[in-house]
Amino acid sequence: MPGKKSPYGLFAGGKLKRKRKRFKWNDITYKRKMLGLVEKYDPLEGAPMARGIVLEKVGVEARKPNAAVRKCVRVQLVKNGKVVTAFVPLDGSLNYINEHDEVIIERIGGPEGRSLGDIPGVRFKVIKVNGVSLWAIWRGKKQKPTR
């Protein structure tokens, strides 16, 4: 009969503690948290939102089984100069965004900070254009200011 993997007995606590401490590092979420990898490689640098300038409008093809072109914009962040792709929500709201507009982006809310649904490689969405909520412009409640 093979032996046990874990030590057991009255004085095994220290050994168990050391083992747990060592094998915790095999857990990817623990490792990411301890080494600060999310903040290190995050374009928003850990912030909930970021300001950026629209470089161009792009269409991203949806993943199977859907057939659609999701309207997105390429945004250069003001804080660090990184360029990210951001999804433009709401029907026809891409018409309210022009190149060189200032937009506020936030995370799209996918699993584990990744992309959401059928939009591949897009982790952010536009929430404001030139300081006004995209939703308010789309609803006709406010007008988009010209810069």
From Swiss-Prot:
Top-level taxon of origin: Archaea
Listed Gene3D superfamilies: Nucleic acid-binding proteins (2.40.50.140)
Keywords of this entry: Ribonucleoprotein, Ribosomal protein, RNA-binding, rRNA-binding
Pfam families: Ribosom_S12_S23 (PF00164)
A Gene Ontology term for the protein's cellular component: small ribosomal subunit
InterPro entries per the UniProt record, alphabetical: NA-bd_OB-fold (IPR012340), Ribosomal_uS12 (IPR006032), Ribosomal_uS12_arc (IPR022863), Ribosomal_uS12_euk/arc (IPR005680)
GO biological process, one term: translation
SUPFAM superfamilies: Nucleic acid-binding proteins
A GO molecular-function annotation: structural constituent of ribosome
Family recorded in the similarity comment: Belongs to the universal ribosomal protein uS12 family.
Subunit text: Part of the 30S ribosomal subunit.
Record function comment: With S4 and S5 plays an important role in translational accuracy. Located at the interface of the 30S and 50S subunits.
Entry protein name: Small ribosomal subunit protein uS12
Gene for this chain: rps12
